[in-house]
Amino acid sequence: MEKLSRNNRVVIITKILVENPNKVIGLNRFSELLNAAKSTISEDIVIVREVLDKLDMGKVETISGAAGGIKFIPQMGSNAKEEFAKELCDALMEEGRIVPGNFIYLTDIMYNPQIISKAGVILASYFKSMDVDYVVTVETKGIPLAYEVAKSLGIELVIIRRENKVTEGPTVSINYLSGTSGRIQQMS
């Protein structure tokens, strides 16, 4: 592979980090992929780190040791969070959102990738310092948000269903007392 310019390397490093949040990526991977020395890659990473930090888009952390490397931790600055909260509140206050039963219609919001990806980054930021193994959600409406939180944390998503499907492999089932109906129900 031909030598790439610094701009090209910075773009590729940023793309790989953003597509793999909270995953440790060794410098060897970048060095081999970009056909550049580790010292050159380290200089490129400094640029990526500074720009993402300056724009409050995330942090690039260095992990020391044999299994070390760098990882990207997505984040939003406080101004961006406030703006997002305001936009979300405005959307929720739109006329016609109250449906029979005095519920708020949320489907269009819960399935909007631009909204849910931001909400996922914000929610994940509250768990970034914890040692979380999985993100768990109950099927259906919560899946997009739980997926985005799991993606931001770099961990797996577990979906709890009322009925298991044979194509999903091994399952664990529990009985629980429903808070709304007061009956014993089962979920897998």
Task: Name every feature range the model reports, one short phrase each.
Residues 2-188:
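PRPP-associated nucleotide enzymes
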